[in-house]
């Protein structure tokens, strides 16, 4: 049974929205009044430590819900200034500013440059220029800091970010692999290999602090890309068939020679996503063990998000065998199998998957978010549906789900009344 992913949020749509809010940037790395940006520093950061302040500025940008091109330009401007100053001995002697370059410095520099591409998605030349400069910063950083884990993770992220903006954006349904269009799976495989390399470096050095929201962004980018490939061409088809039902998505078949065919026709990328998300969660737990009290809240939020996504992934995979079990149990009792599964096989597979989903969904619960409790209850109901009618297992599972729904319903003034009534009537 092929593993599934919850749908991505659509990086291209997000970039398009950001572009509308951005200011015009004339050339790579150029800025305007961007040095006015400031950020509140932690007490442990020295006021004259330029690189430490840059890290704080990047952290603020990454966590901001109102990201802008101006903020990125401010970061790049500061990177430019710091790098110039390291080559100017006279300027360094004129003040007491502390500058100590690191792999993290070059990683921030490169990530900021590549992020600018999302504000210029309609100008392929600019997009290519931003990525070229980003990779140049990675290369410079590698020469100075060859064992930097920060650079390895940053390079993987930049590689995967480039794919939708430079390669997928230029494709049509009738595109074919050739001199002008390459097989996109090759670029994707390279970015995944780079991520695995970064993981090995981090684990070998016991640097589990790298398992944070910023680096999880790579797995989110992969999720978005796979979602984009799954739905490739549908917007065009939907535009041609304006009378189609809203819930009916047109099915787009890609030719074997299409640059996206190898990705769309293979389950290995979904499997890789899940395996790497599970590994990320394991390493995140080690990060949490050694994190400071200040870092714990954000890491706890990230852990719940990972568990939620993994839980949803197993729920989606359970849909097919669960439907086979239901069909063979109640609607096609004379049939021996469906979709290659017997009733008993479908029952066992779906139960195993629902139980795995619950393992993660329970960890994704937030005492302040009743919806996360309901996610657990609904998964329990789905599991209960795969047990024999009126069996002890079914009754116990439904009872536990009911208790959770009652609690959530009371906490939300009846928001989940319909779900609760359906369970009790069933």
UniProtKB/Swiss-Prot annotation:
It is found in: Nucleus. GO terms for cellular component: nucleus. One of its GO terms (biological process) is regulation of translation. This is Enhancer of translation termination 1. Belongs to the ETT1 family. InterPro entries: Nro1/ETT1. Residues 25-35 have a biased composition (Polar residues). Keywords: Nucleus, Transcription, Transcription regulation, Translation regulation. Required for correct translation termination and probably involved in regulation of hypoxic gene expression. Residues 1-35 are annotated as: Disordered.
């Amino acid at each position: 049974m092929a593993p599934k992913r919850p749908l991505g949020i659509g990086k291209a749509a997000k970039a398009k929205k950001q572009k509308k809010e951005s200011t015009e940037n004339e050339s790579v790395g150029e800025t305007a009044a961007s040095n006015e940006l400031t950020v509140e520093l932690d007490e442990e950061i020295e006021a004259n430590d330029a690189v430490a302040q840059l890290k704080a500025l990047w952290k603020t940008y990454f966590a901001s819900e109102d990201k802008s091109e101006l903020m990125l330009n401010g970061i790049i401007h500061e990177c430019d200034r710091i790098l110039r100053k390291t080559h100017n001995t006279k300027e360094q002697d004129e003040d007491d500013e502390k500058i100590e370059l690191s792999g993290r410095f070059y990683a921030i520099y490169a990530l900021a440059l590549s992020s600018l591409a999302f504000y210029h998605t309609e100008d392929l030349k600019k997009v290519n220029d931003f990525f070229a400069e980003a990779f140049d910063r990675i290369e410079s950083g590698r020469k100075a800091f060859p064992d930097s884990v920060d650079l390895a993770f940053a390079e993987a992220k930049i590689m995967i970010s480039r794919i939708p903006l430079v390669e997928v954006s230029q494709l049509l349904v009738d595109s074919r692999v050739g001199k002008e269009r390459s097989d996109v799976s090759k670029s994707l495989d390279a970015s995944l290999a780079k991520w695995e390399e970064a993981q090995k470096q981090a684990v070998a050095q016991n640097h589990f602090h790298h398992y944070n929201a910023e680096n999880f962004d790579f797995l989110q980018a992969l999720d978005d890309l796979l979602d984009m490939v799954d739905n490739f061409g549908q917007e065009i088809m939907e535009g041609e068939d304006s009378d189609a039902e809203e819930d009916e998505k047109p099915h787009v078949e890609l030719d074997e020679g299409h640059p996206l065919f190898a990705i769309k026709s293979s389950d290995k990328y979904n499997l890789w996503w899940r395996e790497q998300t599970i590994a990320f969660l394991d390493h995140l737990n080690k990060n949490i063990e050694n994190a400071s009290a200040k870092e714990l809240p954000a890491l706890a939020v990230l852990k719940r998000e990972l568990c939620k996504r993994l839980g949803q992934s197993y729920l989606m995979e359970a849909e097919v065998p669960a439907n086979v079990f239901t069909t063979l149990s109640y609607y096609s009792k004379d049939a021996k199998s469906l979709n290659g599964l017997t009733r008993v096989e479908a029952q066992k597979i779906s139960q195993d998957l629902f139980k795995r989903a619950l393992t993660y969904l329970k960890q994704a619960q937030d005492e302040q978010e009743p919806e996360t409790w309901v996610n657990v209850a609904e998964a329990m109901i789905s599991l209960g549906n795969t047990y024999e009618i009126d069996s002890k297992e079914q009754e116990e599972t439904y009872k536990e789900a009911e208790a959770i729904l009652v609690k959530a319903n009371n906490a939300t003034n009846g928001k989940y009344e319909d779900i609760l009534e359906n369970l009790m009537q069933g």
